[in-house]
Amino acid sequence: MADMIKVKLVRSFVGRPDKQRRICASLGLHKMNRVKELPDNAAIRGQINKVCHLVSVVD
């Protein structure tokens, strides 16, 4: 399971730019406090980095 990463939406994207909303949607995060398990690759890491103020990585 080392090549999977769990991401949780901890802040709302209401009032955020449309690009950040689309990034959250592409990560599968549509509601607050939901956790998604995603593959750990460079593309996903880059998306998480763009919205790092809205999400957290859960261990």
Swiss-Prot record:
GO terms under biological process: translation
Cleaved signal peptide residues: none
UniProt GO MF annotations: structural constituent of ribosome
Highest taxon listed in the record's lineage: Bacteria
GO CC term, one of those recorded: cytosolic large ribosomal subunit
Alphabetized UniProt keyword annotations: Ribonucleoprotein, Ribosomal protein
Record has Cell membrane as a keyword: no
Family matches, as CDD domains: Ribosomal_L30 (cd01658)
InterPro entries in alphabetical order: Ribo_uL30_ferredoxin-like_sf (IPR036919), Ribosomal_uL30_bac-type (IPR005996), Ribosomal_uL30_ferredoxin-like (IPR016082)
Subunit: Part of the 50S ribosomal subunit.
Family statement drawn from the similarity comment of this UniProt entry: Belongs to the universal ribosomal protein uL30 family.
Protein name as annotated: Large ribosomal subunit protein uL30
Gene designation per UniProt: rpmD
